[in-house]
Amino acid sequence: FKQNCVSIQYLREMRRGESGKNALIPSVLLRGCKSAPDLRQITLRLDDLYGASVSPISRRAGDYQASGFYVSLMDDRFALEGESVLEKTLDFVTELLFDYPTEDGGFLKDFVEGEKINQIAAIESELNDKRVYAAQKLLETLCGQDPYGVPKMGTRQEVEAITPQELLRHYEALRRESPVEVYYVGSADPGRVAELVKRMFAQEVREPRELPRQTDLTPGVRQDRREAMEVAQGKLCMGFLTPITNRDHRFAAMQVTNGILGGDVTSKLFQNVREKQSLCYSIGSGYYAAKGIVLVSAGIDFDKEDHVRREVLSQLEGCQLGQITDEELAASKQSLLTALRSVQDSPSAMENYYSAITMAQ
């Protein structure tokens, strides 16, 4: 690749009351450091590094939340006069991580309040996307008090209540206590990359705490949850809990099964419920491998809800009984193989893939 990437992320158990802070911190850090105190100065510094970019990371990894930076930079092979773009970029990232301005015992108020507005807007955008909103509410209901049910950006109320002082105290705890995961994709010698990363954290006083192991969900009683809204099209989500997670030896078989059920346009749900019977506008299934959840989502007319429910259960039963054609099996396998091959298409895809695998353990 001509472009390399580095991700640096702190891992924390997903907790209510903390997830919003974890998501907010990287964006606040990217507002400025002492040597580049505003967005304009940061942009100029990155331009000098052959157009490198630094983006905030806030993502769910099973029971964990990852917060930090994703860095894209030019490979050293293409730099002028043997310049080390990697070394200089990581030096600047170190400043962004640890050399931030403070006031009154907290982050700069303008930085925090500005990023709170952005994060609240992102939270509310999920409400406007009814498919995403319905899926999140189903996961919250299905997971109960499990960490996987915690919204990764927090709630509006939680974010509004964050103060600059509270946020800085939380970040100091992250720096001190949280395990750090670093991923690099590029042509540099691994030993050299490791030394550069060690140098980044050389001045840190750390007492990292071991994270609890990823947990499995316990099946509960069936629940129905409804929310009335002024919308033209209803969103039906159905969640099914399986005993097969990405830590199970049957993981690959479960991926294939989900593909057959509702993974794409060749699936049972799409072909039978949407195409043949015209019962919905859209339908598909997703496999949340960290918890073994299969989630079916459909856009429907309100008067067709019961019919769609029955048909979803009928197609699921067909999979359970082995009523799967050779064509359905081949199509699901091919879709998964195509997705796996595409991992090697870009540094970002490789970083995301290996990061997810490592943190799932």
Q: What do these predicted regions represent?
A:
Residues D104-K116, Y133-L139, G154-T155, V185, ...:
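Short, surface-exposed recognition loops or helix-turn segments adjacent to catalytic cores
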Residues K2-N22, R40-E95, D99, R131-G154, ...:
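M16 family metallopeptidases and their MPP-like homologs
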Residues A121-S125, V221-K235, T338-P347:
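Short, low-order "capping/linker" segments at domain edges
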